[in-house]
């Protein structure tokens, strides 16, 4: 059975913003490794649209950006949306009955499936479907934005922590 994992970069004051917390090289290398190891990703519409950036090679990309793009393209993707009519390569729409679709996905796969997007993670948390939370804590204060937890914080238990590079700490939690 697959494990659903929600991980995002977070500021010290609890907000997620990919433009303000872009990963530094050590973290980016870790994210490439994770993307290669994952058996898929589940996206909300907005996050999927942002991630479509990786669909087409850019001439200015370095080797690590090309490696991440290749890992991302190879992953099966499930996009939760009622407004999208189509999705890109290696992606499928999830339009109805989120709980049933994710339970089936977890039952059919083995390995780790990433959850992308705080609103989607909130919905999946409320359904009791997320198995692990990874907070990549950055030493910045944003003061506003989208919170990592887009609703009440679930009861969690810290299971590990590690430092990535000089300034990022990964906190790994499971439901308590």
Whereabouts are the PLM-identified features?
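Enzymes that bind and transform nitrogen-containing heteroaromatic metabolites
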Residues: 1-176
């Amino acid at each position: 059975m697959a494990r659903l994992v929600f991980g995002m970069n977070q500021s010290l004051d609890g907000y997620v913003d990919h433009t303000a917390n872009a990963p530094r090289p050590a973290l980016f290398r870790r994210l490439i490794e994770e993307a290669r190891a994952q058996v898929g990703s589940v996206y909300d519409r907005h996050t999927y649209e942002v991630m479509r950036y990786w669909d087409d090679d850019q001439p200015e990309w370095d080797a690590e950006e090309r490696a991440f793009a290749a890992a991302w393209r190879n992953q099966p993707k499930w996009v939760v949306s009622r407004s999208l009519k189509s999705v890109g390569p290696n992606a499928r729409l999830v339009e109805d009955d989120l709980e049933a679709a994710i339970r089936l996905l977890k039952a059919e796969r083995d390995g780790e499936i990433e959850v992308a997007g705080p609103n989607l993670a909130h919905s999946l948390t409320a359904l009791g479907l997320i198995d692990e939370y990874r907070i990549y804590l950055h030493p910045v204060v944003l003061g506003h934005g989208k919170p990592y937890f887009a609703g009440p914080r679930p009861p969690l238990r810290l299971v590990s922590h590690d430092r990535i590079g000089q300034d990022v700490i990964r906190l790994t939690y499971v439901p308590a």
